[in-house]
Design a protein with these regions (language model features):
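Active-site neighborhoods and metal-handling regions in enzymes and metal-associated proteins
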Residues: 1-360
Length: 360
């Protein structure tokens, strides 16, 4: 989808929600709609969209002269940025801004009567970003393929008796660059009872026989993120570990299978959550089933009980049920999925999900 098609999609949602003008200051939103490489800076860049125009407002030092189908309006270091922005807005209409629009630019903007009111435009922006076009879908596939390659190496190249969580995490992070990532990967490595901490920080715990080894990892590739979680067991596995692993894996598969035409985000969450709740472990599944993913690791949007939005073609999100037993261990199994044109799930991760005992 080219830039103008993304802008056209935004305009459709603007009309749906009664927004006549939208001003964006979040560089991620700006990059999605322009591909201009905007970044957070004291020389801020803005994107202004109405039903008839799309305009980049940028400091002339940054130097953009043309962008596909868009006007470019420059201001200088000596200009009052908010006054410059106000010159381009419709003053007798509400102005929608994105949720991360910097307050230091928004509050002074009111002094220039740039609009009758200021409202959030995130609903329209986020719905457009949620529907990945063919280019984005391919980039997400490639990022997940990279994650699969790293996880394959992890099984044989990282762990040994006595290695610490931090040492393992650092070793895995380096592998991402070797496999084509934009930067070293992020990696949660948790041993034993640490795996019962949903967002554990790798520390000095040392690997020992019988430990659950939980690995949650990813990195962007060509700007689009990967994310995958796999649990392993070191040298042996108990019956209780095996029971929980089997339960969580079945919940993961149930969530993925629930992606069907007409399904809502809350339905997908319920398919996995109900399976875990049935044998009495529901209170140990303490988080949403998944999050949207794309230019951000956590794109706006959740697969969660309260989200009644329909699951639609082009959406990309994680499916990551877990059971966390305090003081014992935790198990989470996570894949990324894209909703296909027929409304079902394409699983992006092809790394094995069968129970594995490492170190034998």
């Amino acid at each position: 989808m080219m830039i103008q098609e993304r802008i056209a999609g935004l305009r459709k949602y603007m009309a749906q929600y009664g927004l006549e003008q939208v001003l964006m200051g979040n560089p991620i939103n700006i990059n999605y709609f322009t591909k201009m490489g905007a970044r957070r800076s004291d020389r801020a860049t803005f994107l202004y969209v109405t039903q008839t125009e799309a305009k980049i407002l940028v400091n002339d030092v940054i130097g953009y002269t043309t962008l596909e189908g868009m006007d470019v309006a420059f201001h200088t270091d000596g200009d009052n940025v908010c006054e410059a922005i106000a010159m381009h807005t419709i003053h007798d209409k509400p102005l929608a801004v994105d949720g991360e629009y910097p307050a230091k630019w928004l509050i002074p903007l009111r002094d220039f009567n740039a609009a009758t009111d200021y409202i959030l435009g995130d609903r329209a922006i986020n719905l457009q970003r949620a529907h990945k076009d063919a280019e984005e879908q391919q980039l997400l596939r490639e990022a997940s393929q990279m994650n699969d390659r790293v996880m394959k190496r992890v099984r044989t190249e990282v762990f040994h008796d006595g290695i610490t969580e931090m040492e393992a995490s650092r070793a895995i992070s380096k592998m991402f660059v070797e496999e084509g990532a934009d930067m070293p990967g992020w990696c949660i490595v948790a041993f034993a009872e640490g795996s019962a901490d949903v967002h554990h920080h790798p520390g000095n715990a040392q690997l020992k026989e019988g430990d659950t080894v939980l690995i949650d990892m990813g990195s962007p590739r060509k700007g689009y993120h990967s994310d995958m979680t796999r649990p392993f067991f070191w040298k042996k596995v108990s019956d209780r570990q095996r029971e929980i692993y089997d339960l969580v894996l079945r919940a993961n598969l149930a969530g993925e299978a629930a992606v069907q035409p007409g399904a809502r985000c809350c339905d997908v969450d319920a398919a996995a959550r109900d399976l875990i709740s049935e044998p009495g472990y529901g209170k140990y599944f303490t988080h949403r089933l998944g999050h949207y993913i794309g230019l951000e690791l956590h794109d706006p949007g959740d697969i969660i009980g309260g989200n009644t939005d329909p699951v639609e073609p082009g959406m990309a999100f994680s499916c990551e049920p877990g059971v966390y037993l305090p003081g014992e261990f935790g198990v989470r199994v996570e894949d990324l999925v894209i909703v296909k044109a027929d409304g079902t799930a394409e699983i992006l991760n092809h790394d094995s999900k069968e129970l594995e005992i490492l170190g034998l």
